[in-house]
From Swiss-Prot:
It comes from Desulforamulus reducens (strain ATCC BAA-1160 / DSM 100696 / MI-1) (Desulfotomaculum reducens). This is Argininosuccinate lyase. GO terms for biological process: arginine biosynthetic process via ornithine; L-arginine biosynthetic process. Belongs to the lyase 1 family. Argininosuccinate lyase subfamily. Disulfide bonds: none annotated. GO terms for cellular component: cytosol. It is an enzyme of class 4 (lyase). Pfam families: ASL_C2 (PF14698), Lyase_1 (PF00206).
Amino acid sequence: MKLWGGRFQKTTDSLVEDFHSSISFDQRLYKQDIRGSIAHATMLGKVGIISLEEAAQIVTGLKQILEEIEAGKVEFDVAAEDIHMNVEQLLTAKIGAVGKKLHTARSRNDQVAVDIRMYLKDEIIEIRALLKELVETLLNLAEQHTNTVMPGYTHMQRAQPITFAHHLMAYSQMFMRDMGRLTDCYKRTDVMPLGSGALAGTTFPLDREYTAELLGFAAVSDNSLDAVSDRDFAVEFCAAASLIMMHLSRFCEEIILWATGEFAFIDLDDAYSTGSSIMPQKKNPDVAELIRGKTGRVYGDLMGLLTMLKGLPMAYNKDMQEDKEALFDAMDTVKGCLMVFRPMLATMTVRQENMAKAARGGFTNATDVADYLAKKGVPFREAHEVVGKAVFYCLQQNKALEELTLEEYKELSPVFEDDIYAAIGVEYCVAARKVRGGPAPEAVQQAITRTKERLKQLGE
């Protein structure tokens, strides 16, 4: 008989049982569910709603069930619907009628809310740790490449010379913000809903603060309707996860391009590449491509949650059972991508000579020629026009800007002197950009130092 079956005269249709059941995916909440039940039973005993002896029996039974689940001795029952009913059913079978007192002053509505929040808190901690490891890898790589010149791009066209370290540090800032977003999400998840009941609280004299203390929550919810009916914390996590994936996907897109023969900026390690079933020469960046592809999957999880929630009246609705698969999938996907991306990045070979060669082509020093004129008093817009003509002339003559003679420069503007050549070497162009946040080696090293300090603070 169903634990809620007293009002019903017929058994549930088997098709409905399968359709209705969530145990296939919410069984991963078993630790949190049992932990929440142990805290609830302990609190019930403390305030005298059940006897201390009954509370002890329940706690002992729950701990035994936890051990049995982890030993693989438990086969969950689809007919019991979900992890909550499965655990309660197992408990009653183990300790008898006392087990039926566990659900006193509790609904599955506040029970599932506390389970998800506890689970998400643990996942956020794990994902933040993975992001921290990734940022540390980026910092280590950046320190090795503060003098590795490469082209910076806009519109996928070579724009200005930078360093590989500067490029890596851009991603370090993105992933640091991702860590910050997860920290904020954790704060809003760290609110205990248990004690809210189905929607209207309870008539029992619960000590919610004590339960929150037992479960490690920083705060207790202030409105029972809100506590059981919203999943904005899950949406917030999926939004943060989507941004992590977006940053990973952008980086992977560049890695895929850099690994092509046309760019040849990097070589991926064999351990993070695959071959072709027909073309013997192929070395494919499948890991990066899969991460790029899985990004859309996490976006879908976010959209699914938002769409599921948008039309729900207060308070709990069965639609909300659909929150878990989207949330769990986003968690699993982000973790899996971070776990494989970091070592792929750490083991790739950087082809510095090809990066430097690319930086010297494409007139990446054109802006520096314009800056040269502006520093000598030529209005920048006039300088821009002069250099544009110089580039056009170089294209006609098949020359680089540094290959023009001083006479050719003076035909463009009498302001040019011999010192133009020292000002437009790509290494100088990079080194001259010492402004905070710029690509000069000393500026990048300062950024690395600041980021290490911020990373340390985030970890505290």
